Amino acid sequence: MKRSKKYLAVSQMFDIKKRYPLQEAIKLTKQSQITKFDATVECAFHLNLDPKKADQNLRGALVLPHGTGKTLKLAVIAKGEQAKIAKEAQADYVGDEDLIEKISKNWFDFDVLVSTPEMMPQLSKLGRLLGPKGLMPNPKTGTVTDNVGQAVSEIKNGKIEYRLDKNGNIHAIIGKTSFEEHKLLENLKTLYLQLMRIKPRTAKGNYIKNVTISTTMSPGIKIDPITIA
């Protein structure tokens, strides 16, 4: 793959093979921004897990202490009182059968979809549309719930979803390059502590094999996992 001059210049700022202390890695990440806009900061944890094993296929959600800096559009499938609560919580779109019908016609002007358990039998019929886009509500991520007000509030305040991919990696957005260093550090630590809390009992050897941090379109900087705890 041909890299841009900016990418190559940034890659000279650090050693791609070295594992940096967390604080230094974050400082380098903020300095390595290629784009002119406020770039997204992402981290990736490479775990010594087999996603084919049910008990090792990690998936969940958590609220980052400083959010992600990203504004998400929320759609909520609910009726009656729950629909009213969702509107009061400032969900962008709220509906029941009408909203399900709209989605069935390839309307996807939202980033996260929340549903009450009551509406899931109808919504699940759209699995082929929502599944591949990662939009199908799931109890594990708190997007199937009777407490829609809390769900909307948490997502608006920086809740992220994480899932182990087929290569054993968990990718997550932890902020923007405009964030102060301590905010990026605390967000990354929050995800790290969550992954340690849910470590499968069947996990063997070195649980966290690699951790990298990067901005949009920039090379990844390796972090020494020992410096995160």
From Swiss-Prot:
It holds the Pfam family Ribosomal_L1. One of its GO terms (cellular component) is large ribosomal subunit. InterPro entries: Ribosom_uL1_bac-type, Ribosomal_uL1, Ribosomal_uL1-like, Ribosomal_uL1/biogenesis, Ribosomal_uL1_3-a/b-sand, Ribosomal_uL1_CS. The keyword Membrane does not apply. Keywords: Repressor, Ribonucleoprotein, Ribosomal protein, RNA-binding, rRNA-binding, Translation regulation, tRNA-binding. One of its GO terms (molecular function) is structural constituent of ribosome. It comes from the Bacteria. CDD domains: Ribosomal_L1 (cd00403). GO terms for biological process: regulation of translation; translation. The keyword Ribosomal protein applies. Part of the 50S ribosomal subunit. Belongs to the universal ribosomal protein uL1 family. Binds directly to 23S rRNA. The L1 stalk is quite mobile in the ribosome, and is involved in E site tRNA release. This is Large ribosomal subunit protein uL1. It comes from Phytoplasma australiense. The gene is rplA.
